[in-house]
Amino acid sequence: MGQCVTKCKNPSSTLGSKNGDREPSNKSHSRRGAGHREEQVPPCGKPGGDILVNGTKKAEAATEACQLPTSSGDAGRESKSNAEESSLQRLEELFRRYKDEREDAILEEGMERFCNDLCVDPTEFRVLLLAWKFQAATMCKFTRKEFFDGCKAISADSIDGICARFPSLLTEAKQEDKFKDLYRFTFQFGLDSEEGQRSLHREIAIALWKLVFTQNNPPVLDQWLNFLTENPSGIKGISRDTWNMFLNFTQVIGPDLSNYSEDEAWPSLFDTFVEWEMERRKREGEGRGALSSGPEGLCPEEQT
């Protein structure tokens, strides 16, 4: 920032003579006479004669030359800079309120206090949205960069400001492209990056699937989660490919699974799931049939 200071300079040359700023000759002096006064250029901003300079009156040219440029642009930039500086100070104070004593980051204990001040549960969907906007690399942790960049991304520098953004974040997450980005982020967010994990633990994956589909629960989700829960020995982890493809699965496969084809390029775990679910439904149907028919195949009304 800075102010532009200009100075008005009066022209030093005299007008009315071809000699310009040359020393006038004796012949010129004798012709003009001893009492002749050299014509002076009027100071900036004062009216003068009608002498033209490139088609403009000399007085007008001088006035235009000494006009100062408008400072509205500089003032606007200065005001914006001051506002940004104040916002950074508020963010610094907010970050320090929750950051760990030893590490320059908000860790589990600070995260609990942060969520408590936001009046949200650490395990609820709005916190996942916040982590998404902060592009947090690890659960239960916000680094300084993540916190500052995230707050700037949602234009908030206070607890009240963050709370005020939740409705718009919930609406944004309903957009198909935004939800896809959130969904893919959630897988990475669930990994333990410090351990170099490449797949989600089954229990973590189940919890995150329930969480990320909070606003849009596909019909097949409950069946899928039941399959994962009841087959713990056969499913050790969920790969990134399986996680990403499950979103496509929910969008193209109907709840009755009738349009699923093993010939398509689905993960093998989906083949196992569909086979397991169809067998479960068959057994369930047979059980209902047996109950309705009673002993020896007689209907209940025929047993009396």
From Swiss-Prot:
Lipid attachment in record (N-myristoyl glycine): 2
Swiss-Prot/TrEMBL induction comment: Increases by UVC treatment.
Name this polypeptide is given: DCN1-like protein 3
Gene Ontology CC annotations of this record: cytoplasm; cytosol; nucleoplasm; nucleus; perinuclear region of cytoplasm; plasma membrane; ubiquitin ligase complex
Keyword check for Ligase: no
UniProt subcellular location: Cell membrane; Cytoplasm; Nucleus; Cytoplasm, Perinuclear region
Gene name, Swiss-Prot/TrEMBL: DCUN1D3
Entry note about domains: The DCUN1 domain, also known as PONY domain, mediates the interaction with different cullins. The DCUN1 domain mediates the interaction with the N-terminally acetylated NEDD8-conjugating E2s enzyme leading to the NEDD8 transfer from N-terminally acetylated NEDD8-conjugating E2s enzyme to different cullin C-terminal domain-RBX complexes; the neddylation efficiency correlates with the DCUN1D5-cullin and DCUN1D5-E2 interaction affinities. This domain is also involved in CAND1-, cullins- and RBX1-binding.
Effect of residue 8 to A: Does not affect myristoylation. Loss of myristoylation. Loss of palmitoylation. Reduces cell membrane localization
InterPro entries: DCN-prot, DCN1-like_PONY, PONY_dom
Keywords: Cell membrane, Cytoplasm, Lipoprotein, Membrane, Myristate, Nucleus, Palmitate
Tissue-wise expression: Tends to be down-regulated in different type of cancers, including lung neuroendocrine carcinoma, thyroid Huerthle cell carcinoma and lung squamous cell carcinoma. Mostly expressed in testis and brain. Highly expressed in liver, bladder and renal normal tissue than their tumor tissue counterparts. Palmitoylation stabilizes DCUN1D3 at the cell membrane.
Region of interest called Disordered, as start-end residue ranges on this chain: 1-86, 284-304
Keyword Metal-binding found: no
Pfam families: Cullin_binding
Domain DCUN1: 86-278
Quaternary structure and interacting proteins, as annotated: Part of a complex containing DCUN1D3, CUL3 and RBX1. Interacts (via the DCUN1 domain) with the unneddylated cullins: interacts with CUL1, CUL2, CUL3, CUL4A, CUL4B and CUL5; these interactions promote the cullin neddylation and the identity of the cullin dictates the affinity of the interaction. Interacts preferentially with CUL3; this interaction triggers the relocalization of CUL3 to the cell membrane where CUL3 is neddylated. Interacts (via DCUN1 domain) with RBX1.
GO biological process: negative regulation of cell growth; negative regulation of G1/S transition of mitotic cell cycle; negative regulation of protein neddylation; positive regulation of apoptotic process; positive regulation of protein neddylation; protein neddylation; regulation of cell cycle process; regulation of protein neddylation
Record function comment: Contributes to the neddylation of all cullins by transferring NEDD8 from N-terminally acetylated NEDD8-conjugating E2s enzyme to different cullin C-terminal domain-RBX complexes and may play a role in the cell cycle progression by regulating the SCF ubiquitin E3 ligase complex, after UV damage. At the cell membrane, can promote and as well inhibit cullins neddylation.
GO molecular function: cullin family protein binding; ubiquitin conjugating enzyme binding; ubiquitin-like protein binding
